[in-house]
Amino acid sequence: MDQLRRSLQDAPIIEKDGYHYFVHPISDGVPMLEPSLLREIVIKIIRKASLENVDKIVTPAAMGIHISTAVSLMTDIPLVVIRKRQYGLEGEVALFQETGYSENQMYINDVEAGDRVLVLDDVLSTGGTLKAITEALGDIGAEVEDVVAVIKKVGGENKIDASPYAVKTLINVDVVDGEVVIVDERGDG
């Protein structure tokens, strides 16, 4: 995890409404995402995730897309993007996403009862997004085989902790005194 660790330690911190954010290529698209960093992350995801029975990778728009696309290309597992736009297609399922900084309606298409899915996201912070997604997938009747987030920001309430799903992460960090501190460079799971 050398590149991921270094890139997080070098990440600028911004404050918005009392919440401290790191600005990182994986979570924000800035600064520029180097292919070698993305490759390192994808290899770690493939090694950590339980993929044997997965039919589909499911990821929320927008910052899970680049990671999930790369994993899909490497594994030949189809990708479903949960969108913030409603299309009104048959079988579309709405979910309500609440994070530390926003509330949104999101929409799942192309997931059906019996599908076995990997849920993949960029950052686990409050757990609001992953909780909403896993609940909606359960309501559809899909089987959540695994849940992976690249980066976990520790501290504070994490809504996914109360769910039946254990989220695997690649690295766990905190923001202390305006800097990213690596809490566990191997993550959870």
From Swiss-Prot:
GO molecular function, one term: transferase activity
Protein name listed in UniProt: HGPRTase-like protein 2
EC top class named in words: transferase
GO-annotated biological processes: purine ribonucleoside salvage
PANTHER family xref list: HYPOXANTHINE/GUANINE PHOSPHORIBOSYLTRANSFERASE (PTHR43864), XANTHINE PHOSPHORIBOSYLTRANSFERASE (PTHR43864:SF1)
Domain of life: Archaea
Function: May catalyze a purine salvage reaction, the substrate is unknown.
E.C. no: 2.4.2.-
Family: Belongs to the purine/pyrimidine phosphoribosyltransferase family. Archaeal HPRT subfamily.
Keywords: Purine salvage, Transferase
